[in-house]
Amino acid sequence: MEKGENVMSSYKVFTVNPGSTSTKIALFQGGEKIFSANVSHDAEVLAQYQSLEEQLQYRNGTIHQLLEENRVDLSGLDACVGRGGGLLAMEGGVYEIDDLVLDHSIHAAIGVVHPASLGPSIAKQFADRYGAKAYVVNPPDVDELQDLARLTGIRGVYRVIHLHALNLKETAIRHAGKMGRKYEECNFVVCHIGGGISVSAHRKGRMIDGYDIVGGEGPMAPTRCGSISVADLLEYAKGHELKDLKQLCTKSVGFVSHLGVSDAREVIRRAGEGDKYAELVWNTMIYQIEKGIGAMAAALHGNVDGILLGGGMVYSENLVGQIKEACEFIAPVSAYPGEFEMEAMASGAERVLDGVEAVKKYTGMCSFTGFDFA
């Protein structure tokens, strides 16, 4: 994918994206990826730790070891970027990693514990070691909902969103650049279609609406249920423990519930071999994505400059073709298959280093705290 801002620099940027049993790392020089690796961590060793914070030294050690084995030189580093998470709701952008970011991320201030929250701590340690800047870029905690998207039918219950903000915003930034425009000048419906599915509305540089995929909103996905009737959920809840119901949102439903697999390629294979149930499940997911795109287009009052599709499942020509057929009456559909978190993090740092974008300071205050009159 081409870069939207045409940042031509010699900046050296190291990116870190922790997962459950591995940590993805990448080194960029002048906007080009010159090294990348997926650092594996022993699951049995990780299981010995009671918290994310306790994993930090072990993960750092395995990363340093791999870098040394591959003779990767981080001297002259300009910036380190960590994936982020666990922070309180914030506006999108590039944030300096300071003590408050470190505390809130590693202790999951938002109450959602995920290994990606180790990203800022790892990035800061590398940055301090090499005299570089340390940033987080559009973490999953980005929440820029407009007021109309915030209220629900229950007084005091407000919508929040957790979605693939990093990929969504980077896709929009880069596509705007291809159009010869800035992200802040455009309106897009942007989807990330992978293990989780995010559908979002972007107006003039802000993600004004989207589905809370952690909370179960939006289309069905490989392991997620998507939006379902409250009455049906209450009926289903009978005889189930709360912890099991929470798993329902993100772990054990979607493709897994219907077909016993989470790999979209297997679902496509079965459908292609005549499995009518697999075909129905696959097409239903796409149909729900299409409905979500239509809803987000309405949130933009039909003023849509493009419908952008990113994520691993966008490699499927069938998926892209169906969405184009259903939605291209709204705006042109553009496909950017694959995931590019590492590139997105590096691009964010480069924009700040190049003066294209201003770095922000995390306040530790939610971007939404309620309505005065409610």
Across the structure, where does each feature detected by a protein language model lie?
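Short glycine-rich, Thr/Ser-proximal phosphate-binding strand/loop in the N-terminal lobe
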Residues: 13-54
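Glycine-rich phosphate-binding loops at beta-strand->alpha-helix junctions
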Residues: 304-323
